[in-house]
């Protein structure tokens, strides 16, 4: 998961990449790996305390952490990561990793939906993606096949989660969210070259 180290509207926000590891059956937190700059130590401390306390991913999404815009966001990256993992743990959202997606590209039963904004598409899209901004998704459902496996992505995963919810509420059953969005896809692509 990618999240800003502090409120996005405050100057100087930098992304951090968080990989949370939990038990599949219980959701108990087992570990974390965070790559970034400012605030990584704070987030590792929070997860270390959660591990010591035997907390689960569902506990993380309910945390109430102190914040000020220069140092954190109202929805701290650890809380957002807890929400993402909880959605997956409860079966509310299936995810797909960049490596898993790469293996499926070219499959005629796969439709890839990029819900980023047009100005973000200039930096490139994943080959074969159908580009529909999140704000226009409801009006463009007829461009998509609800019977195909559908992978939704955005820059980091938040908008694609909302896009997946819209699609699910409109009868799409086989939905997956690209973990880490186009940011993680870019990192994966670089690692393969």
Listing of model-derived features with the role each one plays in the protein:
Residues 1-2, 116-118:
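Histidine- and/or cysteine-centered catalytic micro-motif in compact active-site loops
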Residues 29-31, 112, 131:
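Short hydrophobic-acidic sequence motifs that mark active-site Asp/Glu residues
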Residues 1-91:
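Flexible, glycine-rich terminal cap/loop adjacent to redox cofactors
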Residues 58-110, 117-151, 155-193:
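Rhodanese-like catalytic fold shared by cysteine-dependent sulfurtransferases
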């Amino acid at each position: 998961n990618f999240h800003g180290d502090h409120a996005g509207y405050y100057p100087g926000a930098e992304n951090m990449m968080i990989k949370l590891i939990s038990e599949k059956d219980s959701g108990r937190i087992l570990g974390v790996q965070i790559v970034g700059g400012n605030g990584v130590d704070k987030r590792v401390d929070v997860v270390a305390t959660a591990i010591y306390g035997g907390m689960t991913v569902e506990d993380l999404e309910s945390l109430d952490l102190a914040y000020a815009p220069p140092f954190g966001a109202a929805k701290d990256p650890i809380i957002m990561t807890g929400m993402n993992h909880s959605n997956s743990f409860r079966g509310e959202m299936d995810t797909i990793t960049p490596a898993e997606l790469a293996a499926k590209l070219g499959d005629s039963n796969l439709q890839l939906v990029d819900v980023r904004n047009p100005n973000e598409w200039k930096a490139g899209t994943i080959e074969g993606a159908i580009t529909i901004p999140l704000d226009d998704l409801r009006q463009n459902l007829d461009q998509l096949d609800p019977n195909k496996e559908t992978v939704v992505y955005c820059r980091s995963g938040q908008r694609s989660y909302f896009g997946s919810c819209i699609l699910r509420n409109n009868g799409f059953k086989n939905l997956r969210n690209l973990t880490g969005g186009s940011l993680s896809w870019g990192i994966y692509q670089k690692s393969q070259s």
